């Protein structure tokens, strides 16, 4: 089965990876159904911006943006962005999520996903020293000028040294076989 990751890797041979992922998310059925849109990915992939428009497609019973739409609009990015930033020597998985609604939204919402070079170095160092650990990535859905926070999503992301992770999986399989 062809995966989104394989398609992105193939397309990145011809177009910059940020452009491939922006286009890919925006045409992908799994992301299009959120009604959100990726509006910007920096060339270094350290910054991603999305917009979740308020429309009939995501209005709930009381005519505000449905909470599930808010969550699904931001869900894939902390993990996907980090995977692309730290490379194939690491395993990155979503572990858990919390969503906190601050106020009902009746306007377009915006979110940014930002990692710094320093954070990436810390993550790689920690994976080297501890083999596996988790981080919490907080994303705020705001109005365009960021003056009002409508929703905050906290994602717990698992990160592991890939060699360690493979050994851990092998040990788990061997234990079950006994």
Regions found by a protein language model. Give the residues of each.
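Alpha-helical membrane-targeting segments
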Residues: 1-33, 57
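HotDog/MaoC-like acyl-thioester-processing domains
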Residues: 2-15, 105, 116-178
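Catalytic strand-loop segment that frames the active site of acyl-thioester-processing enzymes
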Residues: 33-64
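Short structured motifs
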Residues: 33-38, 95-101, 122-124
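A generic structural signal for short beta-strands and their flanking turns/coil linkers
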Residues: 34, 46-48, 93-97, 107-111, ...
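Residues located in well-ordered beta-strands
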Residues: 37, 98-100, 112-114, 140, ...
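Hot-dog-fold acyl-thioester-processing enzymes
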Residues: 56-77, 91
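Hydrophobic beta-strand-centered segment that forms part of the acyl-chain substrate-binding groove
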Residues: 81-119
């Amino acid at each position: 089965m062809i995966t989104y990751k394989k398609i992105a890797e193939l397309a990145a041979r011809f177009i910059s990876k940020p452009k491939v992922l922006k286009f890919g998310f925006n045409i992908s059925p799994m992301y299009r159904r959120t009604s959100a849109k990726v509006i910007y990915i920096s060339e270094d992939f350290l910054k991603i911006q999305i917009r979740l428009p308020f429309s009939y497609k995501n209005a709930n019973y009381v005519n505000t943006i449905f909470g599930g739409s808010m969550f699904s609009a931001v869900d894939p990015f902390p993990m996907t962005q980090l995977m692309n930033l730290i490379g194939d020597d690491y395993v990155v998985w979503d572990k858990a999520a919390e969503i906190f609604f601050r106020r009902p939204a009746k306007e377009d919402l915006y979110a940014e996903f930002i990692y710094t070079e320093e954070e990436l170095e810390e993550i790689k160092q920690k994976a080297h020293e501890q083999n596996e650990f988790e981080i919490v990535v907080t994303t705020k859905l705001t109005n365009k000028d960021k003056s009002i926070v409508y929703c905050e999503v906290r994602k717990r992301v698992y990160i592991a040294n890939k060699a360690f992770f493979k050994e851990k999986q092998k040990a788990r399989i061997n234990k079950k076989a006994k």
